[in-house]
Amino acid sequence: MSKFLVIEKPEMNLPMSSPNTSEAARVMKLFKSEIEYKAKLQKKGKIVGGGPFLDVSAVCYILDVPTVEEMGEIFFNSPLNPWTHREVHPLGTFADTLEGLKEMAP
């Protein structure tokens, strides 16, 4: 399994000035389906940690998948995928880093 740090930010302006409009209801329904999708991935062990930022409109999580193809499928099936800016960073381990440093030491 490979772990990736994923940071996602919505790339849309939300018309939330009037929360009782049908447009706001559609946006909230879309966001709810995205959070439900993330919760389902967490229950399956694909998301192993993370959650929404409390100070900005974004989420951060650690995705644990066996292949890059599965990661792509997860992103593609995300309800907010067309409106999401995503940063993905592969994660190593501290043990691997220490081993690499030992090999570099004289």
Model-derived regions: residue spans:
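Conserved, structured core segments of small domains
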Residues: 1-106
